[in-house]
Regions:
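Conserved nucleotide-sensing/catalytic segment adjacent to the nucleotide-binding pocket
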Residues: 56-101
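Conserved lysine of the Walker
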Residues: 26
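A glycine- and Lys/Arg-enriched "phosphate-lid" helix/loop adjacent to the NTP-binding pocket
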Residues: 100-168, 172-175, 181
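Short amphipathic alpha-helices and their capping/turn segments at secondary-structure boundaries
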Residues: 30-35, 65-81, 104-117
Length: 189
């Protein structure tokens, strides 16, 4: 399956990715950030896909989820203003696939490496766990926290670890995003 290159308009957007283990406030923060900046947030496609699946997911489903996530990203970036917030990215599929199946489809890795992100917001595990039919590993949050931390740190993409209440996380993220927007504005003049 071929995907179109990101449009030239979306290349001017600040790409922010909220990422972290299960049940760490990623979606909440993504929505709050997008609302604060009156822009779009790209929801996690896996959630909608799995909601419609009438069986346990299999490794082959992960590539379908990756394709759906990319389509969703392209769609939501079209109308974004100044920045776009991604509620996770393909890195989550790599982590889950390697954990559950011991390997990850090379196409998922290629697509992940071809995507551009300007900043990661890594959500900490200090938010209480809430049960959800799609959440699998409440006892492995610390393990996955370390996995995400290592992969984000080694990506070379600037990142900020966000801890505390949802409001504290939002305040810290806004400070970072405002700085990034100001830097971008200064270089474009």
């Amino acid at each position: 399956m071929a995907f179109a290159e990101i449009s030239s308009r979306s290349k001017n957007l600040l790409h922010l990715c909220v990422i972290g283990p299960e049940c760490t406030g990623k979606s909440t923060l993504s929505v709050m950030l997008a609302n604060h900046y009156s822009t779009n947030w790209v929801p996690e496609y896996a959630r909608a896909y799995l909601d419609k699946l009438n069986r346990p997911y299999e490794q082959t489903d992960l590539l379908k989820i990756a394709h759906g996530q990319i389509r969703l990203e392209e769609e939501w970036m079209r109308d974004a203003r100044r920045l776009v917030v991604f509620d996770t990215n393909l890195l989550v599929l790599k982590i889950w696939s390697e954990h559950k199946y011991g390997t990850c489809d090379p196409e998922i890795i290629r697509h992940h490496e071809s995507r551009r992100y300007d900043h990661y917001f890594l959500t900490d595990i200090d938010i209480p766990w809430e049960d959800d039919p799609q959440r699998e590993h409440p006892k492995l949050r610390e393990h996955f926290g370390k996995v995400y931390n290592e992969l984000v740190r080694s990506s070379g993409i600037p990142y900020t670890l966000l801890s505390g209440t949802p409001h504290q996380r939002l305040e810290k993220a806004i400070t970072i995003v405002d700085d990034l927007l100001n830097q971008r504005s200064a270089t474009n003049h």
